[in-house]
Each structure stands twice: as structure tokens, then as C-alpha cells.
Amino acid sequence: RVALSAEFDLNDVVTEMLPNSYTVAARIPEGAPQSRPIMRAHKAREQGVVTMTIVQPSTPLASLATIPFTHERVLISTGSRSGLTISVAVHSSRLGQALGGARMWQYENWTDAVADSLRLSAAMTLKNAAAGLNRGGGKSVIHLPIGTVLTDAQKRDAMLDLGDAIESLGGVYMTAEDVGTSAEMMAIVAERTDHVCGLPADRGGVGEPADATAAGVYASIRSTLFALFGSEDVAGRHFVISGLGQVGGRLASMLASAGAELTVTDVNLAKKDFALLLGARWVDVADAHRVRADLFVPCGLGGVLTDQVIGELGSRAVVGAANNQLANHDGARELDARGILWAPDFVVNAGGVIYLDMASRPDADQKVIDARVATIGDTVTKIFEDARELGITTLEAAERLAAARLDATV
């Protein structure tokens, strides 16, 4: 976060209206940080002028040069309808058809979107293997230039283009919703390929997996509490939730209903109303990790656990739904050195893929699915025990668990 604020006439910027705020893309004045920040405008004033808080990302996006390339195949294409760059990365199909969501997000360069697809698809290989699924790892990412706001027609074109790209791979990869997409958008993808899941129930699909993802995180939280305090009871425990989207919002409601003390935040200031409804304390995004609490629960975008954040963490443990929480692999050792217990994200947030995989089967049984998602907590407990007994980090323990399944197929 940088101490910059400025006033712009709304006619000079690209804006998207949100309930109590604006998302604004504008030219940064000379002397501002060189990398493009994310800007949140708030307190709309008269005569179309807003005051903006400028939030500077603390770490750069992963670049192609820093991503280990161990992937089976990567398809990079330009959508014939949308003109957008689409990257579909298949990291591994050793355990079965690769499964991973479709992300549509703003990046400075199209190569950043490709790098994200490589990073995220590799994480999906670990996630699906650790979850015990007969699925490989893949991910698709659609690059939106910074400041781009798509119309409904343009979103439809992008989804049709994504469907064409996936279909061209011949069934090695199946997609689903992710950040920037939805179950309804997956129904559009399905017009061009059968290799998509998580469509709305009224379109013959199994719906969004957010409930299952939140349930898996909740089970992981209970296991983490037991490791710390000898009790899984969340009542009276203090949680800091960063990100109140589909999963974070559901999780916050679950914890509040169970009697937890909550401190919450989100980049969307309209979420303050939701926080008030829960009886939660609101804190600024940049300060959330410093709050003294039992657990820090990141549920937004990845890369949140930077060296600086780890050094400033005020919680005894980190358990959250966000993907790729560690800004770098060594972050697991830094957390361990500080005595902070970290539940590896690709294990914790596997409830969604478990649901999509099992609910898509002809013999799907919701009770069986719920029971399977609940076992995520048992997996987290095993990871904690293995890490302690072997003197390794929880990340290494989780990677060993996933590798054991992958190696068994060789």
C-alpha cells in the first residue's frame, strides 16, 4: 500500500460501478510506482469526482522465466470472436483427465496470463492427487488487458472461444468455473465442448462448487484448531478472513454461526454491509494479516504470503481457500521458523474439485460427497503429523502425499 491519493473526473477514466464503490483504471501520474497498481475509488463526491486509495501489489506476478516447465502441453491461442489471448495448460494427465477451472482476469501482459496458467495447473496436479481423485491437473486463463470491462456479448464470445480451445485438445482437459467466471458462463462454454463441468442445475449441471470448497476449508480449520489447542471447537476463537467472495463469504457465515469472533476484509468495500450483518469487525485489506488472532484465513487471490506478510503475521496459523498462497516456495520454511502452522492451500481448498468430480458421476450421492469433503480435515491432520515426525515443513509433507499417488501410477 502506498500513500497516494488523487482526484479524477470520471469522464477521464474507465469505470465499472459497484454497489458502494467504483473500480477505476486510470493513467498513473508521474512519480507514482512504475508497476500498475489496483485502484479502489470510494466516497463518491458531487460533480463526478471521486477520491481514490491506490493499492500497490506487494509482489509482481509470476513470470514465464520463473515458472518451472514440467507440463505435458500448453495451448496458447487468440480467440476468433473475442480477440483475447487464451492459455490452456495441461500439467499432468497421469492420474486421468486433467481438471481445473477457467480464470478470466486482468494482467499487464498476455505472458503473465500464460505464466499464471502454468503455475495454477501445476498446483491442480498436486490438489487432485492429494485429494485422492483420478484426475490430472490443468488450468485455463483468459487474458484481459488492464482496465478492460467486457459487455455481456463480449463475455459470451470469450466463453465460446474458450470452448473451442478446450475442444481442440481432444478431451485431455476438463474445465469449470474459477475467478472471473461462473456456472452460467460455463453453460456457454458447453455450447462448444463437452469437456466442462459445474454448469447451473437448471442447465443439467451440478451447480457451483463454492459450498463444498467452504466445507473443506471449515474441516481444515477444525483440524488446525485441534493441532493448536487440542479442541476443534471454533466458538470463541478469533479468525481474520481476507476475502469475502463466494467461498470466503460462505465460510464467514459458517464460522459466525458457530460462535467465532470474526475480523474481515475485502477489496470490495460494499462487503462492509455483510460484515455488519455477521457482527464482524472490519479492517483494511493491507492491515488484516497483522491483526492478533488465532487463525488468518486468506480467501482472495494468491501470493498473499510474501516475506513481509509472513514477518508481520499476527496469527498462530494460516488456513484459507486462496490458491497459491505462498509468494515463494521458501515461505513454508519462513512460516515454520516463526512457529506459524500453515495448512497447505492445495489440500485445504480441494472441496470444490472433489464435488465437481463426484457430483458429475451418474451415481452421485450428496451424502457420500459431503463425507468425502469432510475427510479433507483428516488429510490436514496427517500432514501436520508427518511434518512434525519427519522434521519437514507442512508444504513438503503435502507434496510427499501428492507425489506418492503420482509415483504409484508410473
Where are these regions (language model features)?
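Rossmann-like adenosine-cofactor binding region
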Residues: 236, 267-348
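Adenosine-phosphate binding glycine-rich loop
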Residues: 225, 316-410
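Glycine-rich phosphate/diphosphate-binding loop of Rossmann-like nucleotide-binding domains
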Residues: 208-293
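Predominant activation on well-ordered alpha-helical scaffold segments within soluble catalytic domains
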Residues: 114-121, 156-163, 167, 186-190, ...
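N-terminal ligand-binding/catalytic initiation module
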Residues: 40, 48-203
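Short, intrinsically disordered or compositionally biased N-terminal tails of bacterial proteins
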Residues: 5-31, 36-45, 49-51
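Flexible, glycine/charged-enriched surface loops at secondary-structure junctions
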Residues: 128-133, 170-178, 229-238, 387-399
